[in-house]
Structure formats: C-alpha cells, structure tokens
Amino acid sequence: MTVEYLPVGVKCNLKCTYCYQEPMRDAGNFSVPLNFVRVKDSIIKSGGKFALFGGEPLLATMEHLETVLAFGTEIGNHNGLQTNGLLVNPDHVDLFKKHKVHVGVSIDGPGLCNSARSSDFDTELIISNIVGMLQEGISVSLIITVHALNAMHMRDLLFFIDDMEKAGVRFFNFHNLEVDNHLTDFTLKLSDTENFRAFATIYWHTKRKDIDCLPFKDIRSLLTVEKPYVSCIWSGCDPITTPAVQGINAEGSLTNCGRTNKLGIDWIKSNNYPSMERYQALAITPYAKGGCKDCEYFFACKGQCPGTAIDGDWRNRTKDCVFWYSLIDMIRGDLVDDGVPVLDLKEANQRFLRSIYAPPSRQQTQHSDTPHGDYHGDHTDFTSNASQPPK
C-alpha cells in the first residue's frame, strides 16, 4: 500500500473533461497545507511509503514541496509525484533530481489527442517538459487515457508513443476512460467495440517494444501467474475501505480512493478490515442483473474497479465488461499462440472463489501490496524504470 498525499487537495490548474475528481471540486472539497506535522504522522502510521498527488501537486509552494520531499528522502521513501506536467519549471527539475523523484505525467498524446485536457500550446509545453526531465536523468512515466479523440487520431498517438520511448520513457499506463459526466459521455466515450479496437491496436504496436505497458502486462500476469503482482484495478478492491489507497489530504486526514467518490464527499476513512462482499455478490449474481456469475475470466477481472461500476453503483460489475472480456480473451489467445503456458480458467476461478470466502485474515487478493497506482497502476503512476516492484 502507498499513501497518496494531496498537498493542495484536488485543486488543479487544468479542467480535464473526464476528470473523476470534478464532483469533489463541485462540492467545495478543497484544502491547503495546514498541518504537515499531522500529515507526517499519518504517513508513518500508514507504513512510510507515499507519493504526491492531486489535483495538481505542483500548485504547492516550492518551500512545501522541498519540505515534503526532504521528509521522504529522510525516511527512505521512493519519492514520486503525479502531475499534468504543465507547471514543471527548472526549480522543480532541480528538486526532483535532488530527491530522486519519479515523475508520472498524465497526457493523452500530442495535439488533438490531448485536447480534452489542454490546448495545443500547453500540450507542446508539457511534451517539452517531459523531454527536458528525461534529459536531466529524471525517471518519467506516462498515463495515457484512451478515448474518442486519441482513438480517432491513433496514428498520431502511436508516433507519440514511439517518440516518448526514444526519449527515454520506459513505462506507459493506458487507462480505460472513466465516464462520470454527460460531456464525457457525449464527446469522449467509445463503444465497447471501438474501445477494444483502440486498445488492441496499442497492444500490437507495443508488444515487441522494450517498455512496460499497462494494462497489458497485468493481464498477461493474471493469465499466467497464480499470485501475480498487479495494480489496484485488478485487485478486488473493497469500495468502502479502498485498501490500495490511503489518501492523506493537506490537513492530514485519511481519505479513500477518489474513483469511488461519486458524490464529492470525502467520508472519514474506515478502519475496518477490507471486505470481499462485492466479489462474493458478483460471483453469484447473473450477468443480466449486473453480476459476473459463471464468467470464465472472473478470477482475473473481478468485475473491475468499483469506480467504473454500472450506474455508479459499486455493487454492480464494471460497465465496461464487454471491452475487458474481449481484451483479456485476445491477450490469452496471443499467449497461447506464442506457446506461453496459461492458467486453467476453471481452476483459477475456483481458487479465487475459495479466497473470497476465506476468513478476512486469510483472504488474498492479487494486489500483492502494490503501491497504489505505481509500479504502475491507476493513480500515482510514477516508476523507477524497473520492471519489478520496488523493494
């Protein structure tokens, strides 16, 4: 588990069309760095691993960023930060080098591919900042959310991936679009078939490259390893406690993962042991009723992230079920064609079902203590250029 520290809460300098944090901003849930002493105490109590997140963490003052990263260096943290990349300046670069910060940048490609996030001018500046950080020896990874705009300009996106690889990026996380508002639904949402076609194109384009790409790497692990090291969306997340995320706001209070926060209210984080109740229910609920009963890939998908559930109700499976099933099935077929041994689907499902009905202290998800979002998952998305989890 990794702690996400939000030094400016969910404040951001951009207004991305599809941002899942918008309900929190609409509800007025902003905070400022008022009590870093309390924040440090919360980080230590949570295990001492943390990354800076937002909103946009680079809205914090240089003084505060220095204090936070120096604290991370002091306790032996793998310092990391997730940013949109627009505000990066030479002082930030010096700070990142000083404290060995792994920087994750959220960008959906060049030009029109990224127009749901920023203007063409800002996108060019972000790309320049990425290249500049890489040239200074800073480890950079990318989150690329796949949607109608970059799917429409897929050739530009693939060239961008190639350019970023040549510049030194070794870790890419291709996100499935989370649809939480009408504008996203109307302008960016892909059909299941279109979404599958876009991800499949990226899969085949990157397959032979010397880079790590999610979700493809995770899916291969889920299909070939009994206890794989995978990111949070594959872990059977409890939406009440979100065990992969111990968010800490600027006042030092613990919060849950923002992806399940559909009302914009940061409820006080539960101290309860994570429950597998959602997955016990999905396992026995028919497909027509929003469940996953008898799905051959339930052990791998687990109904996916509760933040993407049908009707925003985490009791349901993901609304993107057809897309994920198709992608998993394609990758399984490719593994078989390549002669890679894959798990027996029936046995894998039986193992997973046994695990979710075990006593809480013996329940096992496939999260393997993955620092949330990274190395390399769904939120914080920085990496150390290593393909293995951090020690």
Regions found by a protein language model. Give the residues of each.
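Short, small/polar residue-rich loop motifs at catalytic or cofactor-binding pockets
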Residues: 235-243
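Canonical Radical SAM [4Fe-4S] cluster-binding loop centered on the CxxxCxxC motif
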Residues: 1-34
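Short, acidic, Ser/Thr-enriched surface-loop or helix-capping motifs
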Residues: 248-251
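Cys/His-rich metal-chelating microdomains
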Residues: 15, 19-22, 260, 298, ...
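Radical SAM/AdoMet-radical enzyme domain recognition
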Residues: 25, 36-51, 60-179, 184-191
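Radical SAM enzyme core and accessory elements
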Residues: 287-391
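C-terminal accessory region of radical SAM enzymes
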Residues: 194-228, 253-303
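Short, basic/aromatic recognition patches
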Residues: 226-236
